[in-house]
Amino acid sequence: MATFNAFRWEHLPGLIAVWNSVFAGGPNFTPLVEQDFLARVADQPSFDPERLLVACDAGGIVGFVHFGPVTNFWYSLSERTINPSEGQIWALVAPPSDRDLVKALLDAAVERLASDGARKIFFHPSWVQCTQPFYNGIAGAYEMPGLSDTRAELLDVLADHGFTPAAHYATPEFDLSDRARLSSLMEAAERIWQRVESAGATRAVRQVRSAFFPPRRVVEIISGLETIAMTAFGPWEEYARAHGRRLYGITGVQVARGWRGMGLGKLIMILALDAAAEEGADAVHLHVYKGNERAWNLYHRALGVQPKHLWLTLERRL
């Protein structure tokens, strides 16, 4: 019978071992190592070891669950807000065949969140729901992607516990070795750029830092003093280290309201693809929320990039 204890540093090797055992062979699997767990979880703002419960039996660590209240903050803790009426479960890791352990870990997290005042709980939320300081880069994508649709046993337990799908996502991937395709997109970008440039716009690339990702590059289109379109991109370091392939991530596209409908979303994406290729990227992927039809159509139709993996967030109202 497993006992649950708050995370302690001596748990770390066993926690990593069970993670790698459970996720091996899954979508975009990258073996977890201590330095990545520290960078992506334990050293992140808001990490609370009391909210990472580790399951141990006589043989050692057999699973864990990590949970907490919804938080929203971007570049500094001074901006942080906490909403205890909504909880989130960032990770539940246990052998899929051990249904009783999975249920026990889930029950423990739900009970703790409910006792803290949660009236709704998200399971594997992505950035659509709230700020995600944890597991970016180590959970199957450059960003925290959600729960893989391949985890059938866990999805079955969640359904039995009243969790229902709240959001669906995809990670489309663009292979930059397809130079003919990239060249065709660059020709389309040049046509859009000529129209925008005639209106006095300029473009720039700069570096940006945040609490959640390694330094990234931002591609911007600027009109006067206003940034009218932008997107950020950077190398997915854990994936490159594990697979020897330089897969980059793109983290969202923003177009100013008064400039929408002019092709700037497509333009800024193509400029980011080109900039990543110039840096030596082999491929680029990004995280798309299916409820955002504008973005879904941009990535899957205008750019012709097809989903490679599918993910979802679930929710339960208490």
Predicted regions and their residues:
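A short beta-loop-alpha structural element at the N-terminal edge
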Residues: 2-17, 176-178, 194-205
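Conserved active-site alpha-helix within GNAT-family acetyltransferase domains
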Residues: 130-165, 266, 290-309
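Conserved GNAT-fold acetyl-CoA-binding loop/helix
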Residues: 23-40, 191-205
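A short, internal acetyl-CoA/4′-phosphopantetheine-binding micro-motif in the GNAT/acyltransferase core
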Residues: 81-82, 88-100, 125-129, 252-260
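A short helix-loop-beta-strand connector motif used in the catalytic cores of GNAT acetyltransferases and
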Residues: 41-58, 63, 74, 209-220, ...
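Conserved GNAT acetyl-CoA-binding A-motif
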Residues: 113-130, 135-136, 140-145, 276-287
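C-terminal "cap" of GNAT-fold acetyltransferases
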Residues: 150-164, 170-189, 289-292, 309-318
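Conserved acetyl-CoA-binding loop-helix of GNAT-fold acetyltransferases
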Residues: 98-114, 255, 261-274, 278, ...
